[in-house]
Amino acid sequence: MTQLSRERYAALYGPTTGDRIRLADTDLLIEITEDRSGGPGLAGDEAVFGGGKVLRESMGQSRVTRADGAPDTVITGAVILDYWGIIKADIGIRDGRITAIGKAGNPDIMTGVHPGLVVGPSTEIIAGNGRIVTAGAIDCHVHLICPQIMAEALGGGITTIVAGGTGPAEGSKATTVTPGAWHLARMLEALDTWPLNIALLGKGNTVSAEAMWEQLRGGAAGFKLHEDWGTTPAAIDACLTVCDAAGVQANIHTDTLNEAGFVEHTLAAIKGRSIHAYHTEGAGGGHAPDIITVAGHPNVLPSSTNPTRPHTVNTLDEHLDMLMVCHHLNPSVPEDLAFAESRIRPSTIAAEDLLHDIGAISMIGSDAQAMGRIGEVVMRTWQTAHVMKRRRGFLPGDTKADNARAKRYVAKYTICPAVAHGLDGEIGSVEVGKLADLVLWEPAFFGVRPHAVVKGGMIAWAAMGDANASIPTPQPVLPRPMFGAAPAAAAATSVHFVAPQAIEDGLADRIAVNRKLVAVGNVRGVGKAQMPLNDATPDIEVDPDTFTVRIDGEVWQEQPATELPMAQRYFLF
């Protein structure tokens, strides 16, 4: 019997069960635990496209028509990295959704072909062999300040944003809010032609229930409570009362100056109800110095924003100027300067690293253009994982590879924000039935620059060479929009997430959008326990004088990183 070495097999078909893959230039390795497309037990029938290869007529390609169930697209031999596992498989896509994960081919001549992966004349092939596939990232904290961020998001592997804003207005530069039905309608129309799913946040800073209900009918998918609009206990309670009735999520940026109360008063106003706490560490805003303690509460869904990820020797220096600009502060006013300095604490930023590694902070977003970078959500997440691997070693259950850590960290920008915002019925993971929002990565560039971004079954963004060249690969190879980013295609492959009340009130008939409006799921029963692999609730204490952080009684010492992977090895600037 002919034998192939593992090295030769990987070169031909991609790695298989038991092989390990390094993620970019980090210290992180993932190990394939199962190969549904080939490998041990299935070797010899791998679905591979190309000259002289398998997926040809009456060989790997069958006669099955689209009407008889052939998929529109098959991604062959991809390594799937998701919260539920790390496996290799062929992925079937039909009508813009994932329809099968298993083995593709022609059952007339092959064994083990998945019924949903029967390749036919109507099937397109994307080669995933040797590549990693993740679910499209969800940026759960986006300021809509300029439309150019949408391209940057796609270029970083993001396919969904939870966002607020109307452009470069002062309210939008500081707060993630699209206030009122008129602005919500215009922004839903403006965003209709981009190949990203959109969930807009209305203004929750009011004690007027009707002011919030009209925003839900106008297209808001949830609310933002921001200190710059006055996050008082009364506003918190009023907002959550409407959220409970509507089933939507509230996102909170608490009172840095402790003017209307301290963290204890905010928690009392929340009354144990589900709430998403933005930039839980506090440099992005929130009760000084101990907002980070909310990460230990079972009803609070905590997230970070990426400028503090991970803690490095440069983190503190860049934050002061960022904060002054974002919150319309005047450096010549001593009170404004004191306000800014109170938010930037190395001890809590350092503790944020550990809280991510133990799964106590569940999500990572960008805070785009408002102290964060939308194109770096994925990259900063894996840099944090690398720093924690170097400092803490393997997580429990890991020995030769970092599967437990990899699954925990990928969940922070995929399934966890999807669950938190009621989007998980449509997106957030590589699972059958969900939108085919998928990102393909070359392992050497994992988390840095995608090979291709598939949005709703179409390639919307990809690394592409000179368009006037004779082949697709000549330099300069740059991230570029593809046909899936064309306006009509983008609308057909993406959705606007809105509150159920908007659909019931006929919003689709009142606004000029071509994409489907999808109701968010009810999240009022979602707590930390529902955050996959990120459900820890440690006891967190912050000394009010020294800002020393204790996590389950232990002091976490500051050791800012001096060098990071996924950095200047990949970028000129």
From Swiss-Prot:
Pfam families: Amidohydro_1 (PF01979), Urease_alpha (PF00449). The active site is at H327 (proton donor). It is an enzyme of class 3 (hydrolase). GO terms for cellular component: cytoplasm. The keyword Transmembrane does not apply. The keyword Metal-binding applies. It catalyses: urea + 2 H2O + H(+) = hydrogencarbonate + 2 NH4(+). Keywords: Cytoplasm, Hydrolase, Metal-binding, Nickel. Its EC number is 3.5.1.5. The modification N6-carboxylysine is found at K224. Gene3D superfamilies: Metal-dependent hydrolases, Urease, subunit C, domain 1. Ni(2+) 1 binds at H141, H143, K224, D367. Substrate binds at H226. It comes from the Bacteria. SUPFAM superfamilies: Composite domain of metallo-dependent hydrolases, Metallo-dependent hydrolases. Carboxylation allows a single lysine to coordinate two nickel ions. InterPro entries: Amidohydro-rel, Metal-dep_hydrolase_composite, Metal_Hydrolase, Urease_alpha_N_dom, Urease_alpha_subunit, Urease_AS, Urease_asu, Urease_asu_c. CDD domains: Urease_alpha. PROSITE patterns: UREASE_1, UREASE_2, UREASE_3. Belongs to the metallo-dependent hydrolases superfamily. Urease alpha subunit family. This is Urease subunit alpha. It comes from Mycolicibacterium vanbaalenii (strain DSM 7251 / JCM 13017 / BCRC 16820 / KCTC 9966 / NRRL B-24157 / PYR-1) (Mycobacterium vanbaalenii). The lineage of its organism: Bacteria, Bacillati, Actinomycetota, Actinomycetes, Mycobacteriales. The gene is ureC.
